[in-house]
Every structure is written in C-alpha cells, then in structure tokens.
Amino acid sequence: MTPSLKRLPEADRPRERLLRLGPEKLSDVELLAILLGTGSRGRSVIEVARDLLHHCEAKDPGGGLRALLHLRDAERSELVKGLGPAKVCTILAGLHLGLRASAAPLRRVDLCNPRAVFEFLAPRMAHLSIEQFHVILLNAKNQVIDVECVSEGTLTASLVHPREVFKTAIRRSAHAVILAHNHPSGDPTPSREDREITRRLVQAGRVIGIEVLDHLVVGQGGYTSFRERGLLTG
C-alpha cells in the first residue's frame, strides 16, 4: 500500500501547512508534493517529490524543476518510479503557469530597453527545447499589445516570412514590433541566417510603416540584442 500523509500530524501535512502559513513558507518538496497529490506503491508523495527534485538537480544544477522542460516525455516518466503521465502533466502545467505569471507584470514596462525585453521573454523562451520566433506588438508608448509565436522549428527565411510577421501587427494597429527567437543550445550568438532574416524584416517594416525596434536572440541566462550590436540594418 502507498504510505499516507495521514500518518503525519495534521499540522505537518503540506496542504494544511500551505493553508495555515502560506506557500512562501513551504519547501520545494512540500509544494511539489501538493501538486503530485499521491505517492506510488510503497513510497509517500513526499519521497517521490524529494527524489524528483534530486534527479532534476542532477540534470540541471541550480535549475530545479526547470530540467523537466528540456526532457522528452519518456525521459520525464523514467526519472522517478511512480511518476506517470498524469503527474508529469500536472507538474508541467504548474511550471508553465508560473512562467507565464512571472512574465505578466512586465507588460506595462518600456520595452525599448533590451534588458527589459529579455526579462519579459526569458520566462517564456529561455528553456524551450525547440526554436520559436516571437513577435512582440507594441503601441505608441512601447507597451505590449500582444505576443505572437509565428514560427516553430529551425529558422529559415521561408518559415519566417514578412507576411506572417506583420499580419497581426497590421490587424492590431501596432505602432512597432520587437522580434525575438530562442536558441535551444543556450548560446545567443546570432547565426548568418538570423542576420539575413532580420535584414528582410527590417526592410519590410519600413515599407509598411511598422518599425522593427530590435531583434533579441534569447539563450539560457543571456541574450543578444541586434540593436545593441549595431546589427539592426536593412
């Protein structure tokens, strides 16, 4: 039988501690145990949570549960005995909600500053396992109207077409756009293809009257700003 948290004094159970003390007082193990809900045969949910965090730390030192974002489905389920697809889905949903919530407060920040753009995008993009091209739509005050993913997969000029990049910008009456894509390798150094795509999009933006303010290449813990590097030419 699965060891039960009911054997613990009620005051020591994670859910009860959260309700009484607030989530900030709980350890990562306790918060993860609440998400998992139950343990596995012969192991309590606390033990499963502790093992999962240990394995994630081994794969990505200092990264914690973020390691799960880089793994394939089969690899996630093999990390810890008793971690089935349903529990993996619950954890991933919690992680992505946290990433989106951490990005939301920056929506009214002046995103002409490349560092602010990176801090806005990093929770969404820095840990993606595949390459994505995003367009940030801005109003006249450089506040975010929306963010749209226009391409997924290795970037090529055929995938990132000006028509797709500016279609929503025109429809939403955007004043300007900021381009961004991630490098799953973690290295934000722009490739020759990145430079060519940027050049074409800057030219297209000038023709239709929607300025491309910057293009950021997002890596893990760092970024390259085309504007800062003097590469925003067309």
Curated annotation (Swiss-Prot):
<dbReference type="GO" id="GO:0006508">
    <property type="term" value="P:proteolysis"/>
</dbReference>
<dbReference type="InterPro" id="IPR046778">
    <property type="entry name" value="UPF0758_N"/>
</dbReference>
<keyword id="KW-0645">Protease</keyword>
<comment type="similarity">
    <text>Belongs to the UPF0758 family.</text>
</comment>
<dbReference type="InterPro" id="IPR037518">
    <property type="entry name" value="MPN"/>
</dbReference>
<feature type="domain" description="MPN">
    <location>
        <begin position="110"/>
        <end position="232"/>
    </location>
</feature>
<dbReference type="InterPro" id="IPR025657">
    <property type="entry name" value="RadC_JAB"/>
</dbReference>
<keyword id="KW-0862">Zinc</keyword>
<keyword id="KW-0378">Hydrolase</keyword>
<dbReference type="Pfam" id="PF04002">
    <property type="entry name" value="RadC"/>
</dbReference>
<keyword id="KW-0482">Metalloprotease</keyword>
<feature type="binding site">
    <location>
        <position position="181"/>
    </location>
    <ligand>
        <name>Zn(2+)</name>
    </ligand>
</feature>
<dbReference type="GO" id="GO:0008237">
    <property type="term" value="F:metallopeptidase activity"/>
</dbReference>
<dbReference type="GO" id="GO:0046872">
    <property type="term" value="F:metal ion binding"/>
</dbReference>
<dbReference type="InterPro" id="IPR020891">
    <property type="entry name" value="UPF0758_CS"/>
</dbReference>
<dbReference type="Pfam" id="PF20582">
    <property type="entry name" value="UPF0758_N"/>
</dbReference>
<feature type="short sequence motif" description="JAMM motif">
    <location>
        <begin position="181"/>
        <end position="194"/>
    </location>
</feature>
<feature type="binding site">
    <location>
        <position position="183"/>
    </location>
    <ligand>
        <name>Zn(2+)</name>
    </ligand>
</feature>
<feature type="binding site">
    <location>
        <position position="194"/>
    </location>
    <ligand>
        <name>Zn(2+)</name>
    </ligand>
</feature>
<protein>
    <recommendedName>
        <fullName>UPF0758 protein STH371</fullName>
    </recommendedName>
</protein>
<keyword id="KW-0479">Metal-binding</keyword>
<dbReference type="InterPro" id="IPR001405">
    <property type="entry name" value="UPF0758"/>
</dbReference>
